[in-house]
């Protein structure tokens, strides 16, 4: 019985590479000369540092551009609020989302059931498993989910025949 998993996970290696490229560009740009602007990473948490709001926006733009070039969807990023640290310096914590949330998993299961395609969807931790009798049914479910779920990037993996 063919099946696949619906997951939502960023490629952390590409995220790390994008951060390194961002830091390199920030260190060489003229408008950041003499400032302490940078991006740091701890596991799934990124911290953006800058001297003022404008430079923080520029750091964010550089990071988003580098992530886009490395095919990492920016919808994985969850921005925290901007905090003041010593002096005029600012920092912002950005979390990289992982897994299909409970609400999104329920929405996916409901969409699959309402589509009247002969497949079953079940929630498996932070993924949704879809089982069906025909591969064509599974492919039509993938197409339907790509069309209907636009607020979160979805990946489809673990195909079984």
From Swiss-Prot:
Pfam family, one: DUF520
Family annotation (CDD domains): YajQ_like
GO cellular component, one term: cytosol
Keywords in alphabetical order: Nucleotide-binding
SUPFAM superfamilies: YajQ-like
Membrane-crossing residue ranges in chain numbering: none
A GO MF label: nucleotide binding
Lineage: superkingdom: Bacteria
Protein purpose: Nucleotide-binding protein.
Entry's family note: Belongs to the YajQ family.
PANTHER family linked to this entry: UPF0234 PROTEIN YAJQ (PTHR30476:SF0)
Protein known as: Nucleotide-binding protein Bcep18194_A5887
Organism of derivation: Burkholderia lata (strain ATCC 17760 / DSM 23089 / LMG 22485 / NCIMB 9086 / R18194 / 383)
Organism placement in taxonomy: Bacteria, Pseudomonadati, Pseudomonadota, Betaproteobacteria, Burkholderiales
């Amino acid at each position: 019985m063919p099946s696949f998993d619906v997951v939502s996970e960023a490629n952390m290696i590409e995220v790390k590479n994008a951060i390194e490229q961002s830091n390199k560009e920030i260190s060489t740009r003229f408008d950041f000369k003499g400032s302490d602007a940078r991006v740091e990473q701890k596991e799934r948490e990124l911290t953006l540092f800058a001297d003022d709001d404008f430079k923080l926006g520029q750091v964010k733009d550089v990071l988003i551009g580098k992530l886009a070039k490395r095919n990492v969807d920016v919808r994985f990023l969850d921005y925290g609020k901007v905090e003041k640290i010593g002096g005029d310096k600012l920092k912002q914590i950005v979390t990289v989302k992982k897994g299909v949330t409970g609400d999104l998993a329920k929405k996916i299961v409901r969409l699959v059931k309402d589509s009247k395609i002969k497949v079953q969807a079940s929630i498996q931790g932070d993924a949704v498993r879809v089982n069906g009798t025909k591969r064509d049914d599974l492919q039509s479910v993938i197409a339907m989910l790509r069309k209907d779920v636009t607020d979160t990037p979805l990946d489809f993996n673990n195909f079984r025949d």
